[in-house]
């Protein structure tokens, strides 16, 4: 399971779904959701600092729903809007074993960090790469939910790490930025090689 990861000022025309799937994580809605294209390192768009969501509208909720479906489709446990070329402060996470308990954080803000922790992280935007990243063991987070209601969350263990990972994305930061320049270059070269191979297979 990858720690997946993961904008406003976006343009709807830049959201290019690869296919449509049935909305499955809520019995309340019966609409179709799009699986979005995930950007991969070293795409410069991943370095964009996301802007706050001014108001939670149906359009924002559609983005949230598409992000959740994309996260499940990619088998990640988290996704930031930056990763799908939407530059707003939106994050979705699901660390549950059942894979049907998505958490939505709009305009998330870490209020407090406590302790030290770290695991070997991966990322949907850096496929095939993993590295140990230092993180706070516990965090207190304030955010809005899918309906625009504010809440505060106390998180520890994997959830705390995932939140920090995804919020890094909103600042244009990737987990590879914690690595040495040499390791970062090796990962970039590996991804470029994979991309060239895939293009030849088309």
UniProtKB/Swiss-Prot annotation:
Q: Name one GO biological process term.
A: translation
Chain segments annotated as coiled-coil in the UniProt record? none
Report the catalytic activity. N-terminal N-formyl-L-methionyl-[peptide] + H2O = N-terminal L-methionyl-[peptide] + formate
List of catalytic residues: 166
Q: Which family does it belong to?
A: Belongs to the polypeptide deformylase family.
- Cite a single GO MF annotation: metal ion binding
Residues reported to bind Fe cation? 123, 165, 169
EC numbers listed for it are: 3.5.1.88
- Note on cofactor: Binds 1 Fe(2+) ion.
Needed co-factor(s): Fe(2+)
Quote the function comment for this protein.
Answer: Removes the formyl group from the N-terminal Met of newly synthesized proteins. Requires at least a dipeptide for an efficient rate of reaction. N-terminal L-methionine is a prerequisite for activity but the enzyme has broad specificity at other positions.
The family database entries (CDD domains) matched by this protein are listed as: Pep_deformylase
Mind telling me what this protein is named? Peptide deformylase 2
Tell me where on the tree of life, at the top rank, the source sits.
Answer: Bacteria
Q: Which UniProt keywords are given for this protein, alphabetically ordered?
A: Hydrolase, Iron, Metal-binding, Protein biosynthesis
Top-level enzyme category:
hydrolase
- Xref: SUPFAM superfamilies: Peptide deformylase
């Amino acid at each position: 399971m990858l720690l997946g990861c993961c904008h406003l000022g976006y343009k709807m025309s830049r959201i290019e779904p690869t296919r449509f799937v049935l909305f499955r994580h809520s019995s309340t809605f019966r609409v179709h959701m799009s699986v979005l294209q995930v950007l991969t390192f070293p795409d410069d768009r991943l370095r964009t600092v996301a802007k706050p969501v001014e108001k939670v509208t149906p359009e924002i909720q559609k983005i949230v729903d598409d992000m959740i479906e994309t996260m499940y489709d990619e088998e990640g446990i988290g996704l930031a809007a930056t990763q799908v070329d939407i530059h707003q402060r939106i994050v979705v996470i699901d660390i549950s074993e059942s894979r049907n308990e998505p958490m939505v954080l709009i305009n998330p803000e870490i209020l407090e960090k406590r302790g030290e922790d770290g695991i070997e992280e991966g990322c949907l935007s850096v496929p095939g790469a993993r590295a140990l990243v230092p993180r706070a063991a516990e965090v207190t987070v304030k955010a809005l939910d899918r309906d625009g209601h504010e809440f505060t969350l106390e998180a520890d263990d994997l959830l705390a790490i995932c939140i920090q990972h995804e919020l890094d994305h909103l600042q244009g930061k990737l987990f590879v930025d914690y690595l040495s320049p040499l390791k970062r270059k090796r990962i970039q070269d590996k991804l470029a090689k994979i991309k060239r191979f895939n293009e030849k297979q088309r």
